[in-house]
Amino acid sequence: IRLSLVGSEMCIRDRVTVVNFWYAGCAPCRVEAKDLESVWREYGGEDVAFIGINTRDQADTAQAFSDEFGITYPSLIDVNTAEAKLAFSEVVPIQATPTTLVLDKQGRVAARIIGPIDGTSILSTLVKDALAETP
């Protein structure tokens, strides 16, 4: 799977991938932002990818949110076409924001968290479990 970001591409094939649907005015998104960044800093790298999918904001607003909360993993803006949201709709409809998905190395949804993550432990465990899976 390839995701196009602003001016670049990100390959998530053979990687555990955390996908977080968010927007700047979402109060629970603001609460979970630092925890998501912590898990990204702990696991992000060759084996784990993180991608934020902003469902409502323009690029300037999304960037201001990332700057305010120290978010270093990439996000894409999915406002005009909702292509990213639609890509998951047949497998796991995104009905609330925030929603966080953990995809296994085969790109299958291994876990879904509806609403804010509550601290780092649950997401860390889900990422560890997905990394430990053998195809």
State where each predicted segment sits:
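N-terminal targeting signals for export/organelle localization
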Residues: 1-2, 132-135
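Single conserved hydrophobic/aromatic residue that forms the stacking wall/gate
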Residues: 1-7, 11-12
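Aromatic-flanked redox-active Cys/Sec active sites in thiol-based oxidoreductases
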Residues: 20-26
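Thiol/disulfide oxidoreductase modules built on the thioredoxin-like
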Residues: 67-71, 80-131
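Short cysteine clusters
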Residues: 11, 26-29
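Hydrophobic beta-strand anchors of alpha/beta hydrolase catalytic cores
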Residues: 18-19, 50, 100
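Structural microenvironment flanking redox-active thiols in thiol-disulfide oxidoreductases
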Residues: 30-69, 80-88
